[in-house]
Amino acid sequence: MNYLKQLKQSGEFEYSLAANAEEIKHIEEELGILLPEVYVNFLSECGSCNYGDVYINGIYKEKDTISYPVVELTKQLREDLHLSEDFIVLHYEVDEFLTLYKVSNKIRLKDAKVFEAEVFCNDKGEFKIDKPTPMFDSFEEYFEDFLSLGED
C-alpha cells in the first residue's frame, strides 16, 4: 500500500517525514518488540499522520526535530495503566479510549489486528483500561478507515 500517496490525495491530512531504518530500530529497542512489516512500511513512508486531532502515531520528524510519540505513549501507558507489552499505542484519546496494535517481541509479524480499549475511572478514582477488543483485522484496514475521515 502506498500510504503517502493516499494521504497526499487529500489536503486535509498532515504527515511527517519518512523514518529510516535506524529510527525504526530505535522504536523496537525502546519498547522491546518487533514491529509488524506493514507498520514498518507505514513508518518508512510517512512516519506518522493525523487528520485534525485523530492520529496514527509513529515517528514525528521535521527538518531538525524528531520525536517518538509511539514510544512515549506506549511506555507511559504501560506504566500508568499497565498496558500489555503485546501492544503499541496508535492513538490515545486522553482518559477515553485507546487504539492499539498487536506486536510481538519474538517474531516479526507481517500484519496484526488493531484493537480498541476504553479507558475508565474506577471507584477508587484510578484510571484503568478495559480488555482490548478487535476493531480491524489489519493495519491496512485501520488505515483505510482513517482515510475515510477525509471524505466527510
What are the residue ranges of the model-derived segments?
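Charged phosphate-binding loop/patch that engages nucleotide di/tri-phosphates or the phosphate backbone
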Residues: 138-152
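A short, surface-exposed interaction/processing loop segment used at functional sites
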Residues: 112-135
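Intrinsic-disorder-associated interaction segments
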Residues: 63-66, 70, 128, 132-136
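A surface-exposed partner-binding patch
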Residues: 1-99, 149-152
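Generic recognition of short, well-ordered alpha-helical interface segments
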Residues: 34, 85, 134-137, 141
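Amphipathic protein-protein interaction modules
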Residues: 92-119
